Amino acid sequence: MIDKLKKSVSKIRRAERSRFKLKKSGSRPRLVFNKSNKYLSCQIVDDIQGVTLAYATTSEKTFSSEGKSKKDVGAAKVLGKLIAERGSQKGVKQVMLDRSGMIFHGRIAAFAEGAREAGLEF
């Protein structure tokens, strides 16, 4: 049985490995997705200049999702649309998705689907 420490260390290593590969290619900004116990957040980061181009989270007062929860699949899809709109205002159309070591399923898949529907390409 895998204990919690080994599982979290494996996740961190996966995230660092994939983040290194994304930074190495470096032609497009990264779309970073993160989930906490209460909220979801994302940001578009330009690694060459070292700046955050756009940021969105479900803890914002202006955020409104279809459901009551701010961390479910519906909220993730709305968050994807919101970050795509903010990115397009800054002139960002193509990004690379940084999943932070998480598998592409559930909230991350819904987030990516919402961002693609709103015009981001990755």
From Swiss-Prot:
Biological process (GO), any one: translation
GO cellular component: cytosolic large ribosomal subunit
Disulphide-bonded residues: none
Xref: Pfam families: Ribosomal_L18p
Keyword annotations: Ribonucleoprotein, Ribosomal protein, RNA-binding, rRNA-binding
Molecular function via GO: 5S rRNA binding; structural constituent of ribosome
InterPro entries in alphabetical order: Ribosomal_uL18_bac-type, Ribosomal_uL18_bac/euk
Family: Belongs to the universal ribosomal protein uL18 family.
Function: This is one of the proteins that bind and probably mediate the attachment of the 5S RNA into the large ribosomal subunit, where it forms part of the central protuberance.
Oligomeric form and interacting partners: Part of the 50S ribosomal subunit; part of the 5S rRNA/L5/L18/L25 subcomplex. Contacts the 5S and 23S rRNAs.
Protein name as annotated: Large ribosomal subunit protein uL18
Organism: Leptospira borgpetersenii serovar Hardjo-bovis (strain JB197)
